[in-house]
């Protein structure tokens, strides 16, 4: 297969209006596709979010410090800030995943810790933004019918200071993001 034919195939099958929705290239890396659409207009998720300050695939470290031996590592889908300066952890899932709420909460705890340490300004994140000392917002974003049934139950047990917003998207989100509910 030549590079030209590969590019042609990608343009045909990795497209929002592709005829074959079951093609492996159409279905591959769905979460990254969703992430790219959210990055293109983060205000679709919430109008309060500042489109000038959204970071994809942010390393999330935990432990007694970012350089501590044995620190937990992860990668947040999106880290943003509201127009008022409040941090926002945005966890995306393109399909049903029982870990969505717990993963989001894990990243929320890490972001709060780094916020309290002053790490974001120290490392050049959110340049020119005065970050609020309030706890970060947590957004759990997925197609509306793709939230795992256990998500609501798990959310009842998270810390009371966590302001969590479930954002349900249209099922055909590849054609453009539309919010069908916010809870």
Feature roles, as predicted:
Residues 1-183:
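Charged, terminal alpha-helix-loop-beta segments
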